[in-house]
């Protein structure tokens, strides 16, 4: 049974600027915490429905992870959805939604649907361990994204 995690943050940049930033997979290195190193990233370009993203990373310096994701939904400048098709989770779908605000700003909504496994043990691990990890990860990512938005406001 998948779980859902949601977090939102106001950004001092337009939905278009933030959509463009998040549609380029190479920008992931700008928002990842120092404990999560992206070692290799492969893609054929920016977000396009069906396009693949593959990356290898190390979490905490010693936990290797390989992810293969696909852009499932791309609706400029409001919605980007990527889904893991191979990797450490049974289910992992990440939606970015950019809600327009006055004065050229926006609110970024991140919703992650995830399951570590398909059994009740997997659900328990997801609810206790993964959810806590996502809180830490996205707090860092949103702080870095707010900083980036202030510096690249348009």
Residue ranges and their predicted role:
Residues 39-86, 143-146, 151-154:
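Glycine-rich portal/gate segments that line the openings of hydrophobic small-molecule binding cavities
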Residues 2-8, 52, 66, 79, ...:
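Intrinsic-disorder/low-complexity, polar/charged segments enriched in Ser/Thr/Lys/Arg/Asp/Glu/Gln
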Residues 1-49:
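Hydrophobic ligand-binding cavity/cleft-lining segments
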Residues 136-144:
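A non-catalytic, amphipathic alpha-helix used as a structural packing/dimerization or gating element
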Residues 15-16, 44-47, 73-77, 97-107:
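A short, structured loop/turn motif at beta-sheet edges
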Residues 83-136:
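Beta-strand/loop substructures that line and gate deep hydrophobic ligand-binding cavities in soluble
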Residues 7-9, 41, 66-73, 84-85, ...:
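Hydrophobic/aromatic beta-strand elements that line small-molecule binding cavities or substrate pockets
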Residues 17-22, 28, 53-55, 71, ...:
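Hydrophobic pocket/interface hotspot
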């Amino acid at each position: 049974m998948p779980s859902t995690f949601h977090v939102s943050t106001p950004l001092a940049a337009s939905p278009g600027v933030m959509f463009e930033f998040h549609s380029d997979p190479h920008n992931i290195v700008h928002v990842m915490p120092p404990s999560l190193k992206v070692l290799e990233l492969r893609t054929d370009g920016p977000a396009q429905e069906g396009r693949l993203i593959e990356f290898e990373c190390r979490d905490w310096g010693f936990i290797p992870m390989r992810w293969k994701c696909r852009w499932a939904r791309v609706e400029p400048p409001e919605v980007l959805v990527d889904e893991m098709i191979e990797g450490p989770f049974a289910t992992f779908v990440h939606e970015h939604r950019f809600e327009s605000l006055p004065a050229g700003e926006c609110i970024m909504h991140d919703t992650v649907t995830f399951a570590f496994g398909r059994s009740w043990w997997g659900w328990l691990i997801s609810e206790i361990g993964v959810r806590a990890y996502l809180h830490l990860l996205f707090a860092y990512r949103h702080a870095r994204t707010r900083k980036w938005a202030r510096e690249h406001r348009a």
